[in-house]
Amino acid sequence: MARVQARKGKTQSRKAATQTRKARVQGNDMIFALDIGTRSIIGMVGIVEENRVHITAIEREDHAERAMIDGQIENIEKVSALADKVKKRLEAKVKTKLTRVCVAAAGRALRTRRADYELELPGTQLIDDEIISRLEAGAIGKAEEAFDAENEAQNDNRRFYLVGYTVCQYYLDQYTMSNLKDHRGQHVKVDLIATFLPSEVVESLYTTMNKIGLEVASITLEPIAAINAAIPENLRLLNLALVDIGAGTSDIAACTGGSITGYTMATVAGDEITEAIMKQYLVDFGTAETIKAQIRQEDPIIFTNILGFEQKVPQEELLQSIKETSGLLCREIADKILEINGGAPSALFLAGGGSKLTGLKEELTVTLGMDDTRVAVAGNYFHANAYSSEYELNNPEYTT
């Protein structure tokens, strides 16, 4: 009997080895993205088809413990283990070994600098990629100089990385342009926003990916990723704002006149609501998260506190217990929107798990002094960039 089991084990091992050899390696047309959030990790795999991504697999796993705070990785070991679990489940679904990943960075110390740069061209020169690269590099250089000078003046010795930039506007012979390539002119200019994050935020993200055998193919910022997913370019002529309310951070971006005009981040987000429930009802973090998720139901919520006593709380009482914290969250988000937009936008999109919180949309509408028909949950425009026959993508949690 033992010999039969041994032979069977060897046969299974050979089959597993054969399956491993047969697994494809991720091709250039396959995109693997990980959203490493404060409460969960969501992974997506898609194939680029005619300028859109066909999403073929999605996996999600929640953190069992608080391994991330305010969008920043605190426990690399735990986050990498969870990310590896998501990656392996996706690999099994798409029968492909995933080697490259796209990620979006968040953090408690996002800082931006706006800069412009211009070039005089000989004659009416054809503008190619090399000229556009020189133009953008010049503006980035000016942004870095201004950023370094400010840090020096404030005796801030922390190391920062330039992690991305967004072009606000191009100019050709004093006229605004959305794209300079293949035009001819004598004078070109670019206006852009450069973004910086502390080195520990970026390095922890790279270390986490390296631990599970992934190369970071691209890194962007969560506010940029959110607005690119939720608001297509043809809508950016309007003055719109997007808030992606996660567990640890609320990522904010604004656009008008066809381009992104600013983005920022607030460290007040869904976890503050969870912590308010913990303190009010003496429950652990996991129980508080479950209670928060059930606020939308009208029936009383039943749970057991840390002392072992069962409690039954009506929805109205629960909403009252988080009212102060919810108001603080809305005021913080509203202040950040007004700061980067110069006023209330014409319309506001809400994304992320926090956008589902009962009453938050209505309270934010009042705080900004907007009409309730001008505030909506994002998701209707995801089809501009991605589609799926297997999954329902119009979920605000899939924004980044």
Could you say what each language-model-derived stretch is?
Residues I273, M278-F285:
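Catalytic P-loop NTP-binding/switch module of NTPases
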